[in-house]
Regions:
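Extended amphipathic alpha-helical interaction segments
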Residues: 107-227
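Bacterial N-terminal signal peptides
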Residues: 12-22
Length: 229
């Protein structure tokens, strides 16, 4: 009877973690360090719930980055940077439809594309105008909204990603995660802080440029800046 109760508590805990990630609330974040410790002490009965919780975290990461890339693409298009806009769109396709298709190689390529697009945008902002003709103000405002929303989602994952970084890769495998996703999870945990910092700088530059050009700045963009380091 005690064993049944303990198993029930573990399953309820894992279900609560998944629900917290899906809710998107700022304080609903995953402590994967505790998850790893529980797995080592709790045996295989927790494997499926734990796998689901980590899978939800990876899918949330994918969703945030797709939103960011959509924002970068809109900003680049607004500035006449067609090559950079296409690069952002291509990078979004690397992420597929969810965490089940992630690979370290795809994540590295996606991160490189984000950085390249950010650099192109930064150079365009510095020159004070679009590459061809006037700035498309509506597309720029839409890009700010998408980038701000993506970074808001991203910032809400930081606690969970930090816990992921402190979890031994062997524990991820014990949680039922396949080796490919376990490698991707470890890569994300290492690269996410620098990635967030770089994208926050891009959003800040874009907001400053919009203000100087009389472009409407969506509230989600300014709110995101307050959440970011």
């Amino acid at each position: 009877m005690n064993r049944i109760r303990a198993t029930g508590k573990r399953l309820a805990w894992a279900g609560a973690v998944c629900g917290a990630l899906l809710s998107g609330a700022a304080h609903a974040q995953l402590d994967l360090q505790s998850l790893g410790a529980s797995l080592l002490s709790g045996g295989q009965q927790q494997a499926a719930p734990a796998q689901g919780a980590i899978g939800q975290l990876l899918q949330a990461y994918v969703g945030a980055n797709q939103q960011v890339l959509a924002g970068q693409s809109s900003l680049a298009s607004a500035m006449g940077l067609t090559g950079a806009a296409g690069q952002a769109q291509q990078a979004a396709s690397l992420l597929g439809s969810g965490g089940n298709v992630l690979t370290p190689a795809a994540l590295s390529q996606m991160g490189g594309a984000q950085q390249s697009v950010s650099q192109a945008l930064g150079q365009a902002f510095a020159t004070g105008g679009a590459a061809r003709g006037p700035v498309d103000k509506q597309a720029f405002s839409n890009g700010l909204a998408s980038l701000g929303q993506g970074l808001t989602q991203y910032s809400q994952l930081q606690s969970g990603l930090g816990g992921l970084g402190s979890t031994n890769p062997a524990e991820l495998l014990q949680a039922g995660l396949n080796p490919q996703n376990a490698q991707a999870a470890s890569y994300i945990a290492q690269s996410a802080p620098g990635q967030l910092q770089s994208l926050a700088a891009t959003l800040s530059q874009a907001v400053q440029f919009a203000t100087s050009q009389g472009i409407s700045v969506p509230s989600v963009a300014t709110s995101a800046l307050k959440l970011l380091p």
